UniProtKB/Swiss-Prot annotation:
Pfam family, one: ATP-synt_ab_N
Top-level lineage group: Eukaryota
Species, as recorded: Agrostis stolonifera
Organism placement in taxonomy: Eukaryota, Viridiplantae, Streptophyta, Embryophyta, Tracheophyta
Residues spanning the signal sequence: none
Classification via InterPro entries: AAA+_ATPase, ATP-synt_VA_C, ATP_synth_F1_bsu, ATPase_a/bsu_AS, ATPase_alpha/beta_chains, ATPase_F1/V1/A1_a/bsu_N, ATPase_F1/V1/A1_a/bsu_N_sf, ATPase_F1/V1/A1_a/bsu_nucl-bd
E.C. designation(s): 7.1.2.2
UniProt binding sites for ATP: 172-179
Protein name, UniProt field: ATP synthase subunit beta, chloroplastic
Entry's Gene Ontology BP terms: proton motive force-driven mitochondrial ATP synthesis
GO molecular function, one term: proton-transporting ATP synthase activity, rotational mechanism
Length: 498
């Protein structure tokens, strides 16, 4: 069947001879539609309901076919609210999957799951569209080169470095700083690497989406005066959206990123906040489609759905997609099927700790729980590897001694253990860092610390050269020279108080 390029609906192609059906049943966001015999739409085809409700308001709902039920009926999931729909309304089969605009015209704009701009800046001037359901790159096209992606955040670059073109998970419960860390990464990467980013807001708070947009405009990541010079495209399917939209918005963002990689041959950063909400939406849809729930009430197709998204995030010989995904951990339980399934796909994990956050150490990245497949001497070099291992050993010994300290006090420790504890506390504080995106709240200017500077700083602490400096001097500073300067300032303040 031929497609009509002059579609009245952005990102969705319609066919010359309309294939129409009628709504048979509506259960929340799920529609059953009856089509004429022999005219059933394919799985993943987009269906459109265009009508008027009882108050004579325009209805324009796009759905996606999920199941073929028999008796010429299909079951589809709506991408927007189904308010006003009634049985018997006409449904048009577009003859194609959902397609979204791609290319340079998407930068600086905010889209919904259908690829429609929602920022009141007018239509998107893009002739190119891609379907959101695409195959993962063929094995022969993949690029297997290993290299580090420098973020400018000390704890990440030293202890759990990110792979260029890899997948990174940010794990943490509610309110420990996942979204702030993502905003800092977007800021640092846009400024230090000049990379193009795509941000997929999957099932998170609308307020956070708005805050992120405003923050990006302030920092220049989105250029209001010349929108084409922006470094990021935003795709939002927030908490108030139906589960169908939240389940597919990650694919919309990924499709836009794939265009930059495959056609523009660029290195792209794909941020997904939050991948757990993608699983959660899939769970809601699965129940509505009548599938039997699996472990902890999740959908039986959890691994398949996650795999179909994650396998498309890959580096090819044309370009790369480096993906950073925030993962909400329900009740801080890392064995929950949603975070556990996500773990299998990741090259690095950045685990955020509530204990560190309660101490006021930000970013609250747990240095012992965070891991990376890149932390090997043949990839990062011996100096980096040995420094990271010594930092971890010192922090691990401090963790083991904490029970003894709590019961008997520091005085009962050996001289060597006391020294280890003192250095570990300095390391713990030096792993904190002022963020550019938090300047407004803290009043401290943000700091970007290069990898070489980070390694030098921790080597100086481990060597004992800075044993004479107070712990507080290492808290919320950039490189090690700032810690030395802060120590002098603290000493002068103490003298003036006396």
């Amino acid at each position: 069947m031929s497609t009509n390029p002059t579609s009245s609906r952005p990102g969705v192609s319609t066919i010359d001879e309309k294939n129409t059906g009628r709504i048979d049943q509506i259960i929340g966001p799920v529609l059953d539609v009856t089509f004429p015999p022999g005219k059933l739409p394919y799985i993943y085809n987009a269906l459109v309901v265009q009508s008027r409700d009882t108050a004579d308001k325009q209805i324009n709902v796009t759905c996606e076919v999920q199941q073929l039920l028999g008796n010429n009926r299909v079951r589809a999931v709506a991408m927007s609210a189904t308010d006003g729909l009634m049985r018997g309304m006409e449904v048009i089969d577009t003859g194609a999957p959902l397609s979204v605009p791609v290319g340079g015209a998407t930068l600086g704009r905010i889209f919904n799951v259908l690829g429609e701009p929602v920022d009141n800046l007018g239509p998107v001037d893009s002739s190119a569209t891609f379907p959101i359901h695409r195959s993962a790159p063929a094995f022969i096209e993949l690029d297997t080169k290993l290299s580090i992606f420098e973020t400018g955040i000390k704890v990440v670059d030293l202890l759990a470095p990110y792979r260029r073109g890899g997948k990174i998970g940010l794990f943490g419960g509610a309110g420990v700083g996942k979204t702030v860390l993502i905003m800092e990464l977007i800021n640092n990467i846009a400024k230090a690497h000049g990379g193009v980013s795509v941000f997929g807001g999957v099932g998170e708070r609308t307020r956070e989406g708005n805050d992120l947009y405003m923050e990006m405009k302030e920092s220049g990541v989105i250029n209001e005066k010349n929108i084409e010079e922006s470094k990021v495209a935003l795709v939002y399917g927030q908490m108030n959206e139906p589960p169908g939209a939240r389940m597919r918005v990650g694919l919309t963002a990924l499709t836009m990123a794939e265009y930059f990689r495959d056609v523009n041959k660029q290195d792209v950063l794909l941020f997904i906040d939050n991948i757990f909400r993608f699983v959660q939406a899939g769970s809601e849809v699965s129940a509505l489609l009548g599938r039997m729930p699996s472990a902890v009430g999740y959908q039986p197709t959890l691994s398949t759905e996650m795999g179909s998204l994650q396998e498309r995030i890959a580096s090819t010989k044309k370009g790369s997609i480096t993906s950073i995904q925030a993962v909400y951990v329900p009740a801080d339980d890392l064995t929950d099927p949603a975070p556990a399934t996500t773990f299998a796909h990741l090259d690095a994990t950045t685990v955020l700790s509530r204990g560190l956050a309660s101490k006021g150490i930000y970013p609250a990245v747990d240095p012992l729980d965070s891991t990376s497949t890149m932390l090997q001497p043949r990839i990062v070099g011996n100096e980096h590897y040995e420094t990271a291992q010594r930092v971890k050993e010192t922090l691990q010994r401090y963790k083991e001694l904490q029970d003894i300290i709590a019961i008997l006090g520091l005085d009962e420790l050996s001289e060597e253990d006391r020294l280890t504890v003192a250095r570990a506390r300095k390391i713990e504080r030096f792993l904190s860092q002022p963020f550019f995106v938090a300047e407004v709240f803290t009043g401290s200017p943000g700091k970007y610390v290069g990898l070489a500077e980070t390694i030098r700083g921790f080597q100086l602490i481990l060597s004992g050269e800075l044993d004479g400096l107070p712990e507080q001097a290492f808290y919320l500073v950039g490189n090690i020279d700032e810690a030395s300067t802060k120590a002098i300032t603290l000493e002068e303040e103490n003298k003036s108080k006396k």
